[in-house]
């Protein structure tokens, strides 16, 4: 009895060694309530709420799972202030431990696989900025399309893809030189991008066309574009399964997640979820998909083996994005 | 009017002509449209630079001169049906594209339609249906509203306000959209030749984002832009968007938007019956 209590007490004490044994946590950015909901993925319950005071949107975990980065914007989209930043949440203590400057109105970003750099889109400036995560210094500011939005880093860290909603473009940044090497013409209002685990393909959602576009990352050429939900789904979030076999797309207007065969791009399942799913994230083993349903104020959890919703987790107001940290 | 640079090959430059009197003689609607066109051209130039291309805007009151010396491939303007008739005729005769920013006349899309003319401005028929659909007393029918927020509308409104110190209205949106639409057509058609632009604009592939949440396109039978409109009552907080999709109905954006205006079977436009001698440059 006593030893059980002691064991419990020890397990509650946070230490790096024990952090590896903890269940994965899902961090959800709530744009409306200006906080972050933390969901324990074993119980699918909210175990903490972290206030951030301003609008949080883009959210990503560091590769080692110890930190979660979240893009914060103040109420003045065309001016840089203290409110515009990338906040760093320490996963163990669930506290904001640092803030990085990332230009004005940062919305989306990607962390390089080595965890060393962060590339963010500055929506109102039409730029993407590269930040050194060790020093917090902005290394480069690059001109991309108008109203940049989605940012994705290739698994080898070589390429950064940045979508731009008004220009209908995807800018390709060579991360070794921090230069835009080419621009890809997308369909209407490209939103999010995701690479396949082998890095050979990139998938881009186009909100107004209602399409998913596939890019050959060797040539940065569009291979094809497929309509989802008859073109009316307003797709936003996209993720690829760890084995590369499945692509998941959140269709905001259709309140459904589409599951596609990555090879044929045929729809293999359509999963109704809560209203306006935008941000989606997979657990590292690919067995659960978490979808932030903005107008339902819930995160819906999908079992990817059965393609069914297995939990609905009430979170804050207007959940926007979700990131899974170990 | 700046002299055209002879070194610029046409394929890399889209030259657009805005037909307007001098600033002093402009109505508020013309001034708004001009602001929209200027911002549209600035943004199109930024987007074009990503692909090593150029967008050039030339302004003047003399449309024939813009087409001749200015070497424009498209004319923007039209703030009264008579002017749209004249500009549509000139564009047709000289083999360039004309984009109507402000004429509502149904006949311009009907008996008097021309293959070279494309109407961003909504027709009187569209306005009438929007008004009856909306159920808002005393509301004006608009293409745009400074209070719109969804689908990046807030971004567009903020960009316009930052650029000009005032809100974007319907005419501002029409001017901005017309340039964006022309530039994207040239890029996707891989040609800035008027004939290629026209063929692209008439094709099923031609779809545009105007920050209204639906793909916008031109009706092939009368070259009218399909677009949601907004009815704003003076007392209301936010404008009402029309048409709205029927709940539960499985309609495409095109089907929804075609509820505004003249359907194909009722159209009096005979686009294919171009007069002899009517040719577009590049054909």
Task: Give the location of each predicted region.
Chain B
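Extracytosolic ligand-binding ectodomains
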Residues: 1-283
